[in-house]
């Protein structure tokens, strides 16, 4: 199995992966596995119990959303599954909006960001009135 629109593998946790969680939340949701290499092989994590506590709190505090964090085991190696549901409202990471596209995380900027926010808030450009010319 390869990384795809809804699956990302990381060998260990870094706080920057909150951007990936943000991207999944703004797209169709997905799962991040901590303790798996780029080939999808379980390599395990040594601090699984700490991650089970830290990750949900960091996601809540930084992104304002809730994700499921589960401890899994394969061949005696523990790894973490972070299950991110899609959110209908735009989710940002420190003022930046990320989006999962294919097997990549994209930061939305400019016209793409405007379009994304308008779509998520149910608005259209033609309903905005310019008051001065």
Regions found by a protein language model. Name each.
Residues 1-133:
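Conserved N-terminal catalytic/coupling substructures associated with nucleotide/phosphate chemistry
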